[in-house]
Amino acid sequence: MHCPFCTAKDTKVIDSRLVGGGHQVRRRRECNDCHERFTTFEGAELVMPRVIKQDGSREPFNEDKLLNGLNRALEKRPVSTEQVEEVVNIIKSQLRATGEREVSSHLVGECIMEALKKLDKVAYVRFASVYRSFEDIREFGEEIARLGE
């Protein structure tokens, strides 16, 4: 790897360790020419499946869309940024684990619902009310009752 300080082509790895739950490798490097030290992170480049929407159109998986939906449901809830990031990683892993090149938006929604149910029940109900398009208060009440079971 080139040194970011002097652009020399020869650097050596001083230390390596797993970070990010074992999904990344953090390496401390030192330039053989200028002796400056720097850190690099190495992670697998994983391809996410495309999403098939309800109207049949297809679009690339959009992590920002997932994060925005979660954040809207979790607004003013006692959930840390780290917990939200962990949920995003879990959902992405579940979608990749299908082994499919394309997944339905329904599957994405169900993965989100399952994750929110475990993380925060209020956020789950908020998300479910939009995702399932409750028609009246009765349907809303039934969903809340199912949470208590």
Swiss-Prot record:
Keywords: ATP-binding, DNA-binding, Metal-binding, Nucleotide-binding, Repressor, Transcription, Transcription regulation, Zinc, Zinc-finger
Transmembrane spans: none
Cofactor annotation: Zn(2+)
Molecular function in Gene Ontology: ATP binding; DNA binding; zinc ion binding
GO biological process: negative regulation of DNA-templated transcription
Cofactor: how bound: Binds 1 zinc ion.
Residue span(s) of domain ATP-cone: 49-139
Keyword DNA-binding among record annotations: yes
The keyword Repressor is annotated on this UniProt entry: yes
ZnF (unnamed) residues: 3-34
Record-linked PROSITE patterns: ATP_CONE
InterPro entries linked to this entry: ATP-cone_dom, NrdR-like_N, RNR_NrdR-like
Known function: Negatively regulates transcription of bacterial ribonucleotide reductase nrd genes and operons by binding to NrdR-boxes.
Matching NCBIfam families: transcriptional regulator NrdR
Listed HAMAP family: NrdR (MF_00440)
Family stated for the protein in its record: Belongs to the NrdR family.
Protein's name in the database: Transcriptional repressor NrdR
Source organism of the structure: Pseudoalteromonas translucida (strain TAC 125)
Gene: nrdR
